[in-house]
Amino acid sequence: MAMKKLLIASLLFSSATVYGAEGFVVKDIHFEGLQRVAVGAALLSMPVRPGDTVTDDDISNTIRALFATGNFEDVRVLRDGDTLLVQVKERPTIASITFSGNKSVKDDMLKQNLEASGVRVGESLDRTTIADIEKGLEDFYYSVGKYSASVKAVVTPLPRNRVDLKLVFQEGVSAKIQQINIVGNHAFSTDELISHFQLRDEVPWWNVVGDRKYQKQKLAGDLETLRSYYLDRGYARFNIDSTQVSLTPDKKGIYITVNITEGDQYKISGVQVTGDLAGHSAEIEALTKVEPGELYNGAKVTKMENDIKKLLGRYGYAYPRVQSQPEINDSDKTVKLHVNVDAGNRYYVRKIRFEGNDTSKDAVLRREMRQMEGAWLGSDLVDQGKDRLNRLGFFETVDTDTQRVPGSPDQVDVVYKVKERNTGSFNFGIGYGTESGVSFQAGVQQDNWLGTGYAVGINGTKNDYQTYTELSVTNPYFTVDGVSLGGRIFYNDFDANDADLSDYTNKSYGTDVTLGFPVNEYNTLRAGVGYVHNSLSNMQPQVAMWRYLNSMGQYPDNTNDRNSFSANDFTFNYGWTYNKLDRGFFPTEGSRVNLNGKVTIPGSDNEYYKATLDTATYVPIDNDHQWVVLGRTRFGYGDGIGGKEMPFYENFYAGGSSTVRGFQSNTIGPKAVYFPSSSRHDGDSGYTNDCKSTESAPCKSDDAVGGNAMAVASLELITPTPFISDKYANSVRTSVFWDMGTVWDTHWDSNAYGGYPDYSDPSNIRMSAGIAVQWMSPLGPLVFSYAQPFKKYDGDKAEQFQFNIGKTW
């Protein structure tokens, strides 16, 4: 189009001139039609100046130069005596860009593509570029199966040579696959082959992966899956001959036909390794061993190549080349693999750099490195550093990049690119509950204090039954060897009666200090000491409570509901953690085991031990780690020493968002059985309706008392979160779950209390199922769950919807 205008303009100029081929001298240059473009800018773009002798070639070059600026859609050059007259029509300026009807493509993505093509507010409108964009967008819709889609650019003129640009989308509907045919398959049925496709002509309700909507990219992926399926089963001569995609007349249906040649199955006759093995021939040959008569397997060949690259990478060969060439013998149906290895140069690490850590100090990241500067590059050490950064929980993503140093044949820089997440949480709330009354809660937890890696927490709770404050600090690198030091102090004023638990009041305070010793990359041992003072009062005469007091030599009066008792305890605290999760925040693969325990030491009033074991295992079931199975368990047990019992206030409880969802917090397990007391014969809360003032026998209640043993398990399926863009995919997690748990009292005497539930029976398991959503919000982690209990017992209290701020187990 531009050349056509150029030709016309040249002809006009030629017809308007009366000079010969030798040209004429230009004394002045005048412009007509300039609005937005300054005269000076237009003159600078021209190869002609006043005083120059102008020929036809100069005029043609002038017109080309003015068109090349992109500011004009028409240019004419005329002669008026000794004056060169340039008549132009400026392209209109884009005043605004809007979109309408686009659902599959977001506005931000469209704006990025337009800007990449030079279409933005304030720039000139190039109608040719707009036409190309229209076609490109329509091609995109065709590739995802929307063959009836159309994209039209609507240009609305405005004053001062400006325009509004609006892209109007009519996306239509995606064409659905009516039938997929595979022609030429004999060894495997069509249904078996299609079962591995993402695209399907039939999708059962339970298949959340299959899709009937045609997409060109998915078809390409399915064809590669088909090829791999045959190659992995020995069909070395397998070939996809052709693929036909047919569209129905109404553009709503797709028929796909794939023509294949299976060929025969081939066995591997041997593997020959050649090339530069960098002195590691024995190790490489060990990776290429095959069993006699083993079928050719494309996936195993690829794995073998990658294993060789990883092996060489551990020794500093950062860019090895490994190529496998199959030598196919059709006569005996065998394949001999020729593996050519070129180790390449061995590289040193010049520098290790970090990018994206705007808050975290470099030293916090650098101390997690296992690769050293100045040493040979080890790919396994680089990966260990990445894993350790992920497990810190400070980052949403961690990526590595090995960059060659310009001008150096044997040096690289290792760059860790991180995206930081909010490592702190702040919560403040005022609420009202039927059990707690008016409730105030506030807390600050920062796992990466001022970017130093310190974990600092200040928490407090105030409601009708509890006043609690705690200050905790942990230095994960108390020594350069990675020994951690943590400590806390706390105060707790707790009225169990108002919390719907067994009736007593406990005012406690204490402190503890713990050292953590790294054993290896994945294991840490902990040891520490603690002190706690418990002051118990207003203890109602209750069987489990009185049993503990009797073991302590107190022998309280069963009719007195104002008993008091205090204890000072010193404890040895211990723990072990095994952590091989792929990251500390929203992990998708690996396991974590956490053992915590304590035992009283000489000088304590109580004598007991207590331990808790937590496990979590994540197993991805797809390559992208979007679908993950999570299994969790928690076991707890405690008991007295030397004839004493573990204090009842140390009992285990279950129920709530951190154990068995769908049940009210701490309500699963044994319930309190009260002795009659004179002040409670008035029907005060705590007794069931079966307890009358005239009774002298113990009375059953719905107040939870907990137990000295606990078992909880959960099976969870983590799924992609619907309606969430990729930008927030790492901040939101959705799952469906099945929880189960039980709490029991191993010292409960079912013979002595035959008319009551057997609280020593661990088989009284509660179960629930539901859905949960976790969101890493700017205020910290928020957890929402809805669960329906489907196995419960008398006295249990359901709570289907639960909301929690903070980490769950």
Curated annotation (Swiss-Prot):
InterPro entries listed in its UniProt record: Bac_surfAg_D15, BamA/TamA_POTRA, D15-like, OM_assembly_BamA, POTRA
Location in or out of the cell: Cell outer membrane
UniProt entry tagged with the keyword Isomerase: no
Signal peptide: 1-20
GO CC terms of this entry: Bam protein complex
A GO biological-process term: protein insertion into membrane
Keywords: Cell outer membrane, Membrane, Repeat, Signal, Transmembrane, Transmembrane beta strand
PANTHER family, sorted: OUTER MEMBRANE PROTEIN ASSEMBLY FACTOR BAMA, SORTING AND ASSEMBLY MACHINERY SAMM50 PROTEIN FAMILY MEMBER
Protein family per UniProt: Belongs to the BamA family.
Name this polypeptide is given: Outer membrane protein assembly factor BamA
Species this chain originates from: Klebsiella pneumoniae (strain 342)
